Amino acid sequence: MGFFKSLNSKPTPKEVAKDRLKLILIHDRGEIAPDIIEKIREEILEVISKYIDIQVEDVEISVNKNGDEEGENTSALIANIPIKSIKGR
């Protein structure tokens, strides 16, 4: 019965957020438009706020690009999200 449940189940918000973050990190070339970053910010905060009380006004999210010695460019999503409390405790 668990097998059939796993075939028809929707991904959890945690899994969706994780997949979105992976896509951002994979996108290591090119610029990310500010409107896309804002949309990512909104969606991440929506998922996180289901589990944690956060200070939305103090959230900082940015994308940093770095180059290494071999000329490879990498990007990192940096999120500073102040936590008020964990829900369900």
From Swiss-Prot:
Keyword presence, Phosphoprotein: no
Keywords noted in UniProt: Cell cycle, Cell division
Classification via Gene3D superfamilies: Cell division topological specificity factor MinE (3.30.1070.10)
Ribonucleoprotein keyword on record: no
Signal peptide annotation: none
A Gene Ontology biological process term: regulation of division septum assembly
One Pfam match: MinE
Similarity comment: Belongs to the MinE family.
Function: Prevents the cell division inhibition by proteins MinC and MinD at internal division sites while permitting inhibition at polar sites. This ensures cell division at the proper site by restricting the formation of a division septum at the midpoint of the long axis of the cell.
NCBIfam families cross-referenced by the UniProt entry: minE, PRK00296.1
UniProt name for this protein: Cell division topological specificity factor
Organism whose genome encodes this protein: Clostridium beijerinckii (strain ATCC 51743 / NCIMB 8052)
Gene field: minE
